[in-house]
Regions:
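Major-groove recognition helix of helix-turn-helix-like DNA-binding domains
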Residues: 99-116
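Helix-turn-helix/homeodomain-like alpha-helical modules used for DNA recognition
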Residues: 145-148
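Short, amphipathic alpha-helical segments that act as regulatory/interfacial helices
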Residues: 16-19, 23, 68-75, 109
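General nucleic-acid-binding
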Residues: 1-48
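Short Lys/Arg-enriched helix C-cap and helix-to-coil transition segments
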Residues: 115-138
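Short alpha-helical "recognition helix" segments of helix-turn-helix
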Residues: 82, 87-101
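Short, Lys/Arg-enriched N-terminal segment that forms or immediately precedes the first helix
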Residues: 45-59
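Short, amphipathic alpha-helical "recognition" segments used to contact nucleic acids or chromatin
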Residues: 61-88
Length: 148
């Protein structure tokens, strides 16, 4: 009989921990940006900061992957851990990149493994993301101290 009560207490503890983890996941996966109208502005910033420009024929696959990661960080952080891309983001990026289908954007998700594997790639993305964050704060688009 004592064992059954101990198991119920353990079950209760597990349930409480799952609720706490779900709340934390929700907080961490909440996007900093939700308004898709900012994506072209962010693209312009990316072109400026990375040294690429539309006159040179647009972005190569590596640059598109970098920009995608930055967009996912701001608009769909859950995607960076295997979740789905937030509705509307793929369509906007497909149009921006000149893709015929939004599914082509999903093919760029290899950039996530590049980010995890290659230190130089990660450093570049982190620097760009930090600069974007500074500019978004300066422009009042996100609060000075967002909850992460």
């Amino acid at each position: 009989m004592l064992q059954e009560f101990l198991e119920i207490e353990e079950l209760k503890s597990i349930h409480e921990e799952k609720l706490r983890l779900m709340e934390r996941e929700m907080a961490l996966s909440t996007p900093l940006l939700t308004e898709l109208e900012y994506i072209p502005m962010l693209y312009k910033w990316y072109c400026e900061l990375s040294g690429c420009c539309e006159e040179s024929g647009g972005l190569n696959a590596n640059q598109k992957g970098q920009f995608l990661l930055i967009i996912l960080f701001f608009y769909s952080p859950i995607t960076l851990v295997g979740g789905r891309i937030v509705n509307g983001v793929r369509d906007r990026l497909a149009k921006l990149f000149g893709f015929n289908s939004p599914s082509a954007v999903s093919n760029l998700r290899d950039a996530i493994s590049f980010y995890e594997t290659y230190k130089g790639y990660r450093k570049t993305i982190d620097q760009l993301r930090d600069e974007f964050m500074s500019r978004l704060k300066e422009n009042g688009i996100i609060p000075q101290n967002p909850i992460l």
